[in-house]
Regions:
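Alpha-helix capping/helix-boundary segments
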Residues: 9-10, 41, 73, 96-97, ...
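Active-site neighborhoods of divalent-metal-dependent phosphate/nucleic-acid chemistry enzymes
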Residues: 65-111
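Structured helix-beta-strand junction loops
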Residues: 31-32, 63-64, 104, 119
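Generic structural signal for small/hydrophobic residues in well-ordered secondary structure
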Residues: 6-7, 45, 77, 101
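Acidic, PIN/NYN-like endoribonuclease modules and their adjacent C-terminal/linker elements
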Residues: 1-2, 98-130
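Residues that scaffold the ATP/ADP-binding catalytic core of kinase and kinase-like folds
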Residues: 12-13, 48, 77, 119, ...
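General small-molecule cofactor/ligand-binding pocket signal
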Residues: 36, 67, 124
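Short, well-structured N-terminal submotif of metal-dependent ribonuclease cores
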Residues: 1-37, 46-62, 130
Length: 130
């Protein structure tokens, strides 16, 4: 199973503030679990990084497979926005991340499930490792 890691989880892993998320992150990479990210998440994290932290953030990105946004993802995200932007306040970034998960058959690892009312992909259920 591929796991698409949302920006909120990447921030927690980078900052190391949530031990449960960090433990789950360390347990995840395996031949059966590829860790994916969207360039949208890279943008969100890079925007807020301090210059002294850039190398550490690059190391985090190196542990991920960045899945490029293509036309299929763009169309799917556009469909999501047509359907959910007014009723659920879905924004473009969340539409693109959700579409990436759906197109690549990946489970989305996020704590912001309210941002993702779509039903054509699964969520990753973080195990309790404590």
């Amino acid at each position: 199973m591929n796991v698409l890691v949302d920006s909120d989880i990447l921030i927690e892993v980078f900052r190391g503030r949530d031990a449960a998320i960090v433990d789950a992150w360390r347990a995840l990479p395996s031949p059966s679990h590829a860790l994916l990210c969207s360039p949208v998440s890279i943008c969100e994290l890079w925007h807020g990084v301090r210059p002294a932290e850039q190398n550490a953030l690059e190391a985090l990105f190196a542990a991920l497979i960045c899945v490029p946004v293509n036309a299929e993802i763009g169309r799917r995200a556009g469909d999501y926005l047509k359907r959910y932007s007014k009723s659920h306040s879905v924004e473009i970034v969340d539409g693109l991340i959700a579409a990436t998960a759906a197109v690549h058959g990946a489970a989305l690892w996020t704590r912001n499930r309210k941002h993702y009312p779509m039903r054509d992909f699964d969520f990753y259920h973080q195990p309790d490792l404590r």
